[in-house]
């Protein structure tokens, strides 16, 4: 196995037993692929598929005028170049978007001609607003902040059959219903009521008998009965009738008379129930008709209208129940043969027949009027309006669309062969749905499970953006249609017809404020990846928290390999927000698919097939861990499999597929938890969620015990810098890496230089610090895709969210009671859990009514010391250390004329005007914040002169850019001349500076020759002359291109900024705040074991082992058994082994042992037992072995993948190799007394995360502050600078102590007694410390509330 440049430096020992069949797919592909399909930017306009923008345009255009004499057709669209790149957009606070230009064609027809001859065609490109673009990491920059559009899980369009679970009617009877859900348009529901009639609802309105809908479609009562019932034929006589016998229909009936065969033998006696045996005998006897008494007809229902042949009038209508008089009437009319509906109680009920009886309508028009009245109550119906409404409901393409998915699901559910068809409903669709519903009510067929992932589909970014775009286009369509009639007469161009505002507004609204467009969670790389892979059932067209029941939130068998069963938020959204499983993807219909390996005749192949939940249920699927032999044949007699959403066993021959990997069940976050298989699910959920809240530490440290997914997450998250092309590192410093690209990977005429500018100390959305550090050295050879620089929480290209801490499980003086954590001062000293937070503080200078605000260092009534950190423009300088209340940006605001006191008048007379007509509104550092200024940005409105600071920042940026371009040119030039040197060396010249014809070029001569003179050489070989010309041209072009780029940058920097109305200047100051770990901070392991630091203990007081090594953290052992997350204990043991091995290697290096010994030890560690992933140490050079060992000093990193991790025996073996006790326990001594503890203690290394719940952000104290308006009580919460609530239980406590005066003070002057508190303040000023409590304001509020109820209440003074 070949290792990449970074993997070689620190190889993880992998404990997995199963070979890897497929790599983890790119983690952000769900976002990127969807948006790529939406824009189709790389595709030529004529090759574009009908998806995304193209489909939206196609569905709305052509727009035809009302008269039909003009039409506007869509030709194609193109997306321009964005004005600013992503970084510039974030700085300037604008949206990263590109202009969308649409080519449309206006066609005007000749009114006079009969066959619509074309009179005029105009084609033009129309600007349709800005289209936000996705960054390469799957995010959008909207108004300068990074946002993510979360995919939505919604009910797939199609038809669903369901019942109410017996909740509607008191009898508990199941009422069945069918619902046709389109992608857009009206919903159509059919439902049974408790009396078994079928009703229809449109858009969940009032219900009507279902036959009204069918009658509206043009069916008569006879046709309806014919569609839904079979008939029995009778030929009538006066006494007896003959029934055409279909024996199977008699089953279950009670014979009302003896049934005899043709010879007169009785087969069924009167009063007996007819069974299957009787039916067989009847069939055997070959009876085709039965003589039955006329009474047998009573209660049956006529299937067809009885028409008097002579007069043509209807004697008896169809669906009439036969009674004695009806039968007599029929006989009198001389009708011999009649047909009745065949119904029974078992499997064909009289539902449609009953429905027709309650149907008041007789003609299609009456039916349409009924439907019109239901949809638009109170409007008078006309024939046209009724027909129009009905046709627009389900049969018009503009108003109704099932979409390809809906049509496929509908056809599949109704048992049809083809999966395509039209987007609107057909008559057959409606009838088939009704037939299926009635069949289900009759006991044939099953209702659907709406929580099955085969019935829920994922809407990704592209699809949601397309829908929004279509909404905008439809708004435009109306306006265009009205203007088209003018186009003919006034000769308008397409541009005059289309107003792009509504489209742009719809798109902007979606990206800016849709429920699914969320502020990106940017705590660390994992939280970014997880946020982009999130799947939410909430949002427009989805569920709401309040209404979602348990079933929707629950884990469903079809989640297997598609949606993670572990990772979901705790709280009201549990189960509604899910995470995509590691290997899952969504197919063209939007259903989630999971990959499986094909199994043929019990042999596992390497062919991988993706199956959706619909397809999967028919197959037998084995687990990834099923035992196989060398020939990949399944060895067990019975294999554990999944089949039809159940877990069962099956013989190997019956198996069709097998999982690709044990971790395909879980999401990325869950797959980062080692020994996940030993943790309780609830705790694993917390572990997965808390990893997303880990703050990047100052020095990242990779976990000693990982799962092997760390590298994938770090690289796919996009926080690292990876090489675009292979090559050699030309130069590297803190801020950029320059790579000279391999010749093979450079295209002709290309520079062959890649410059990577690193992101230094930038603020993330969560105020954590994004910083990239290069991990390559000059001269290193790298390949494409290698990690060149680590991002936040990344260590040598692997995700590193926390720190490896030496922990002991033991109680310690109650300091770790109830999940508290005791940490050693050593952790603070070594800055192990120190984090950097960056806060952005913004100062805005506006134009006010009294004049404009000014940013200046000349602030009234402020001492010299307060201004010491400001420059002459009034802005703090970079590097200043500031604390609470310090001025960052000096700003003065003009204030209105006020009445002046005599003293002020005197001052004005002496010092002139300035002092008093402005007030100080400077931007100060908020309370509780201390930090260093690391960056300042100044934005000035167009047309306003820039101050000195803005100009200096601008110059600095330009200089940096110029240096980049210069360096790039220098390297390109160097590479060009190197190539020329190689080509020209030893070649013959025709002429050249100081050369004779026919001379050979020497390397020394060329080295001396000034570079400008190289191109004066004329060579004998014509190809070389061409090369010289090309190179000269190439360098010339490059120079011009650089100048153009520089001018573009300069233009961008020097133009004014587009600021909000009324804003003159914005100054943004960035503070870097260093947060050490302290009591009150929240920390957690990866197994849901979270706690708050209770104390930081001096090193000398911490428990230590016999070698004098203290532990870093003491955890409570009681946190393990009841929580059932034993994974943390196994992690601790394996961590101890990993660290021990590291120390062993470290000792060998310090003793300067030979390389062979190191190789032997590494071989013992990496390649001992039945590991599948052997490490090929021979492929590493001695130098690489030494570098590897040096990196292993801190511990040998291990990978124990989920559900395929290290077994107990392997952990023990590792402990042995490290020279530790296999129990994993150590004798510890008390740091304060030096006595040994009574029994050995589990000591080891656990990976600890510092979560973004820091005491500094929560701690807060109030002296005086604002009060609530109504109750006059202090506000609550840190944001409002509020007070601490003294609640009812606290009042009880003071009552219990009898502390009457303290209590009175709490309830009056300290809370809401307005007069009391002002009086008390005055008293304190006068040096008199008495308080006189008055009436609390909340009592007055109570009195007012009682009065508002109409109860008279008065306060009487005694």
From Swiss-Prot:
Per its UniProt record, what InterPro entries does this chain match? Answer: DNA-dir_RNA_pol_bsu_ext_1_sf (IPR042107), DNA-dir_RNA_pol_bsu_external_1 (IPR019462), DNA-dir_RNA_pol_su2 (IPR015712), DNA-dir_RNAP_su2_dom (IPR007120), DNA-dir_RNAP_su2_hyb_sf (IPR037033), RNA_pol_bsu_bac (IPR010243), RNA_pol_bsu_CS (IPR007121), RNA_pol_bsu_protrusion (IPR007644)
Question: Might you name a Gene Ontology BP term for this protein?
Answer: DNA-templated transcription
The broad enzyme category this protein falls into is: transferase
Basic and acidic residues bias: start-end ranges = 1033-1051
Q: Record's Gene3D superfamilies?
A: 2.40.50.100, 2.40.50.150, 3.90.1100.10, 6.10.140.1670, DNA-directed RNA polymerase, beta subunit, external 1 domain, DNA-directed RNA polymerase, subunit 2, domain 6, RNA polymerase alpha subunit dimerisation domain, RNA polymerase Rpb2, domain 2
Positions of the region Disordered? 1033-1053
What EC number(s) does the entry state?
Answer: 2.7.7.6
Q: Which Pfam families match?
A: RNA_pol_Rpb2_1, RNA_pol_Rpb2_2, RNA_pol_Rpb2_3, RNA_pol_Rpb2_45, RNA_pol_Rpb2_6, RNA_pol_Rpb2_7
Q: Name one GO molecular function term.
A: DNA-directed RNA polymerase activity
The chemistry this enzyme catalyses reads: RNA(n) + a ribonucleoside 5'-triphosphate = RNA(n+1) + diphosphate
For this record, the Gene Ontology CC terms, alphabetical, are: DNA-directed RNA polymerase complex
What UniProt keywords apply to this chain's record, in alphabetical order? DNA-directed RNA polymerase, Nucleotidyltransferase, Transcription, Transferase
- Free-text function comment from the UniProt entry: DNA-dependent RNA polymerase catalyzes the transcription of DNA into RNA using the four ribonucleoside triphosphates as substrates.
The entry describes its oligomerization and partners as: The RNAP catalytic core consists of 2 alpha, 1 beta, 1 beta' and 1 omega subunit. When a sigma factor is associated with the core the holoenzyme is formed, which can initiate transcription.
Q: Which family does it belong to?
A: Belongs to the RNA polymerase beta chain family.
- Protein name listed in UniProt: DNA-directed RNA polymerase subunit beta
* Species for this entry: Marinobacter nauticus (strain ATCC 700491 / DSM 11845 / VT8)
The protein's gene is named: rpoB
């Amino acid at each position: 196995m070949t290792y990449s440049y970074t993997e070689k430096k620190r190889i993880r020992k992998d404990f997995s037993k199963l070979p890897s069949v497929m790599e983890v797919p790119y983690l952000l592909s769900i976002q990127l692929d969807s948006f790529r399909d939406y824009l189709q930017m790389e595709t030529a306009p004529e090759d574009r598929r009908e998806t995304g923008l193209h489909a939206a345009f196609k569905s709305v255009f052509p727009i035809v005028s009302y008269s039909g004499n003009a039409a506007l057709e869509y030709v194609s669209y193109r997306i321009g170049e964005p004005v600013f790149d992503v970084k510039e957009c974030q700085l300037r606070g604008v949206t990263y978007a590109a202009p969308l230009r649409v080519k449309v064609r206006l066609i005007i027809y000749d009114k006079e001609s009969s066959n619509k001859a074309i009179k005029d065609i105009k084609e033009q490109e129309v600007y349709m607003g800005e289209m936000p673009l996705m960054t390469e990491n799957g995010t959008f920059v909207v108004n300068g902040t990074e946002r993510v559009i979360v995919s939505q899980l919604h009910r797939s369009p199609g038809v669903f059959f369901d019942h109410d679970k017996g909740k509607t009617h008191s009898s508990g009877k199941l009422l069945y219903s069918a619902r046709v859900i389109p992608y857009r348009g009206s919903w159509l529901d059919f439902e049974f009521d408790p009396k078994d009639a079928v009703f229809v609802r449109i858009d969940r309105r009032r219900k009507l008998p279902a036959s009204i809908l069918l009658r509206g479609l043009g069916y008569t009562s006879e046709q309806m009965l014919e569609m839904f019932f079979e008939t029995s034929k009778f030929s009538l006589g006066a006494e007896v009738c003959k029934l055409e016998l279909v024996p199977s229909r008699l089953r279950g009936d009670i014979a009302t008379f003896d049934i005899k065969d043709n010879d007169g033998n009785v087969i069924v006696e009167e009063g007996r129930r007819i069974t299957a045996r009787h039916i067989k005998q009847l069939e055997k006897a070959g009876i085709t008709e039965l003589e039955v008494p006329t009474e047998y007809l009573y209660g049956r229902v006529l299937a067809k209208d009885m028409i008097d042949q002579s007069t043509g009038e209807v004697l008896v209508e169809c669906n009439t129940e036969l009674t004695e008089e009806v039968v007599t009437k029929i006989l009198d009319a001389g009708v011999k043969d009649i047909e009745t509906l065949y119904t029974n109680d078992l499997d064909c009920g009289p539902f449609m027949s009953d429905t027709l009886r309650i149907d008041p309508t007789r003609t299609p028009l009456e039916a349409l009027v009924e439907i019109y009245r239901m949809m638009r109550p109170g409007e008078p119906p006309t024939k046209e309006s009724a027909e129009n409404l009905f046709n627009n409901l389900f049969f018009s393409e503009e108003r109704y669309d099932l979409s390809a998915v809906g049509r496929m699901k509908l056809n599949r559910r109704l048992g049809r062969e083809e999966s395509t068809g039209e987007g609107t409903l057909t008559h057959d669709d409606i009838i088939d749905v009704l037939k299926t519903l009635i069949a289900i009510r009759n006991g044939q067929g099953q209702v659907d499970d709406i929580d099955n992932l085969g019935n829920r589909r994922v809407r990704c970014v592209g699809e949601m953006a397309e829908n929004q775009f279509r909404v905008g286009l439809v708004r435009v369509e109306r306006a265009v249609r009205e203007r088209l009639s003018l186009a003919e007469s006034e000769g308008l161009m397409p541009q005059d017809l289309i107003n792009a505002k509504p489209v742009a507004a719809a798109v902007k609204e979606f990206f800016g404020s849709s429920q699914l467009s969320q502020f990106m969670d940017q705590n660390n790389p994992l939280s970014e990846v997880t946020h982009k892979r999130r799947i939410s059932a909430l949002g427009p067209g989805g569920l709401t928290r309040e209404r979602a029941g348990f079933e929707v939130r629950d884990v469903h068998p079809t989640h297997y390999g598609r949606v993670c069963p572990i990772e979901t938020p705790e709280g009201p959204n549990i189960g509604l927000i899910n995470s995509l499983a590691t290997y899952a993807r969504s197919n063209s219909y939007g259903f989630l698919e999971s990959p499986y390996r094909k199994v043929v005749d019990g042999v596992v192949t390497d062919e991988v097939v993706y199956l959706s939940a619909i397809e999967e249920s028919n197959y037998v699927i084995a687990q990834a861990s099923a035992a196989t032999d060398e020939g990949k044949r399944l060895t067990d007699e019975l294999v554990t499999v999944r089949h039809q959403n159940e877990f069962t066993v099956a013989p190997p021959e019956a198996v069709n597929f097998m999982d690709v990997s044990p971790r395909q069940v879980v999401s990325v976050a869950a797959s980062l938890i080692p020994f996940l298989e030993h943790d309780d699910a609830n705790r694993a959920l917390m572990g997965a969620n808390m990893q997303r809240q880990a703050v990047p530490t100052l020095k990242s440290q990779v976990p000693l015990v990982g799962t092997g997914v760390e590298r994938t997450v770090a690289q796919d998250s996009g926080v690292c810098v990876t090489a675009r092309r292979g090559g050699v590192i030309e130069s590297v410093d803190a801020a950029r890496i320059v790579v000279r690209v391999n010749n093979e990977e450079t295209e002709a005429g290309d520079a062959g230089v890649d410059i990577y500018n690193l992101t230094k100390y930038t603020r993330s959305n969560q105020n954590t610090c994004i910083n990239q550090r290069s991990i390559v050295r000059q001269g290193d050879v790298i390949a494409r895709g290698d990690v060149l620089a680590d991002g936040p929480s990344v260590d040598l290209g692997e995700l590193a969210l926390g720190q490896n801490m030496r922990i002991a499980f033991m109680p310690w003086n109650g300091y770790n009671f109830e999940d508290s954590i005791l940490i050693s001062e050593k952790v603070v000293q070594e800055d192990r859990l120190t984090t950097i937070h960056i806060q952005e503080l913004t100062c805005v200078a506006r134009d006010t009514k009294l004049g404009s605000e000014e940013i200046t260092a000349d602030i009234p009534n402020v001492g010299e010391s307060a201004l010491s950190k400001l420059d002459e423009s009034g802005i703090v300088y970079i590097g200043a250390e500031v604390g609470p209340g310090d001025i960052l940006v000096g700003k003065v605001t003009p204030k209105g004329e006020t009445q002046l006191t005599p003293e002020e008048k005197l001052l004005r007379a002496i010092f002139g005007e300035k002092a008093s007509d402005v007030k100080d509104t400077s931007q100060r550092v908020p309370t509780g914040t201390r930090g260093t200024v690391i960056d300042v940005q100044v934005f000035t409105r167009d047309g306003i002169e820039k101050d000195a600071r803005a100009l200096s920042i601008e110059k600095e940026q330009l200089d940096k850019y110029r240096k980049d371009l210069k360096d790039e040119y220098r390297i390109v030039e160097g590479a060009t001349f190197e190539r020329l040197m190689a080509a020209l060396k030893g070649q013959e010249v025709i002429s050249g500076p100081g050369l004779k014809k026919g001379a050979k070029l020497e390397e020394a001569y060329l080295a001396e020759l000034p570079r400008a003179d190289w191109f004066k050489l004329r060579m004998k070989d014509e190809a070389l002359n061409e090369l010289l010309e090309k190179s000269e041209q190439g360098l010339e072009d490059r120079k011009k291109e650089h100048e153009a780029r520089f001018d573009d940058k300069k233009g961008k920097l020097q133009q004014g900024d587009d600021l909000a109305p009324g804003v003159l200047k914005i100054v943004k100051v960035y503070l870097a705040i260093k947060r050490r770990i302290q009591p009150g901070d929240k920390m957690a392991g990866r197994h849901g074991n979270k706690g708050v630091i209770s104390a930081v203990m001096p090193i000398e007081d911490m428990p230590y082992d016999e070698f004098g090594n203290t532990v870093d953290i003491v955890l409570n052992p009681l946190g393990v058994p009841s929580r059932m997350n034993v994974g943390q204990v196994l992690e601790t043991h394996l961590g101890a082994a990993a660290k021990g091995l590291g120390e062993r290697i470290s000792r060998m290096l310090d003793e300067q042992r030979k390389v062979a010994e190191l190789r032997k030890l590494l071989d013992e560690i990496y390649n001992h037992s039945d590991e599948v992933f052997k490490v090929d140490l021979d492929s590493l050079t001695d130098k690489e072995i030494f570098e590897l060992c040096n990196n292993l000093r801190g511990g040998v990193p291990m990978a124990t993948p989920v559900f395929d991790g290290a077994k107990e025996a392997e952990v023990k073996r590792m402990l042995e190799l490290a020279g530790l006790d296999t129990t994993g326990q150590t004798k510890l001594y008390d740091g304060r007394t030096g006595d040994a503890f009574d029994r050995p203690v589990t000591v080891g290394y656990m990976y600890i995360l510092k979560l973004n719940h820091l005491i500094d952000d929560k701690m807060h104290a109030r002296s005086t502050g604002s009060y609530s308006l109504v109750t006059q009580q202090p506000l609550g919460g840190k944001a409002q600078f509020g007070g601490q609530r003294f609640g009812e239980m606290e009042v009880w406590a003071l009552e219990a102590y009898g502390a009457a005066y303290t209590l009175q003070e709490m309830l009056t002057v300290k809370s809401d007694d307005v007069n009391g508190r002002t009086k008390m303040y005055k008293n304190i000023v006068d040096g008199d410390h008495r308080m006189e409590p008055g009436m609390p304001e909340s009592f007055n509020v109570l009195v007012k509330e009682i009065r508002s109820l109409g109860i008279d209440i008065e306060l009487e003074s005694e």
